[in-house]
């Protein structure tokens, strides 16, 4: 599929959304009561996340970047004070973004707006919910507040996403109330290798559980759950489904259209792109290209077209993960 064809599809989707909004407005004029999103049930939270499948969520730090993301076809943005690459370089304590900046982004674009809070920081998450963000990322990119415990997310109306390096880690986050999982990768490096490793680790354990389930060996599933400190019911559900029971995005080091296509090929439901777009020298083209490659990841011709839209000379500076000290790794936070 050519780029012009993909834009035609996006325009049809846009027209459909506008038609639905107009229908809603007419219904409201006729006295229909609209239930606000803030009263969302778990079913609505999971349903909203499912609508992001197959898309790209882009990290942004201001309204201008958010507009570029929306114009490129992103399904959402994640607002930060600094991009992960800059967080890594700056050091110190990384906190949630300025609430006024988040509000400004929400007023500027029409796609869902997400924001990060520190691991274990209940009140950062509560404030993000209060101002009306669509999704909260309890993220290892920011400086953890609690090294031992994550937020109990069932108390919130807004959905959460958490990072994971393995299936047990993912299932623990889901048990705590996460509506979405993403690979941790190694954020801010421009190196997709860790995201690949984490996605394969999750897939490998799912295949093992699926094998137990098909063989009728429920006791083996119970032993897996006990030895990995995860609820048996979640392990059993995962074994029965043959996949995570929630949407699973890829994140951490995605910097090119080919990176995005690779993660989709490995089984991701979509991708988060952090520094890869706005630390490059061609953010507009790269954003469009990554969206195109994510959407048509199983079409080599289209992925090649997307990759041709960008130049390696304009890519973000990469960081060799093997040269990072253990204490410099973000992925080890919040296991």
From Swiss-Prot:
Originating species: Hyperthermus butylicus (strain DSM 5456 / JCM 9403 / PLM1-5)
Family: Belongs to the PdxS/SNZ family.
Active site per UniProt: 116
Record function comment: Catalyzes the formation of pyridoxal 5'-phosphate from ribose 5-phosphate (RBP), glyceraldehyde 3-phosphate (G3P) and ammonia. The ammonia is provided by the PdxT subunit. Can also use ribulose 5-phosphate and dihydroxyacetone phosphate as substrates, resulting from enzyme-catalyzed isomerization of RBP and G3P, respectively.
Binding site for D-glyceraldehyde 3-phosphate: 200
Transmembrane segments: none
Name the record gives this protein: Pyridoxal 5'-phosphate synthase subunit PdxS
Pathway per the UniProt entry: Cofactor biosynthesis; pyridoxal 5'-phosphate biosynthesis
GO MF, any single term: pyridoxal 5'-phosphate synthase (glutamine hydrolysing) activity
Catalyzed chemical reaction(s): aldehydo-D-ribose 5-phosphate + D-glyceraldehyde 3-phosphate + L-glutamine = pyridoxal 5'-phosphate + L-glutamate + phosphate + 3 H2O + H(+)
Binding site residues for D-ribose 5-phosphate: 59, 188, 253, 274-275
Keyword line: Lyase, Pyridoxal phosphate, Schiff base
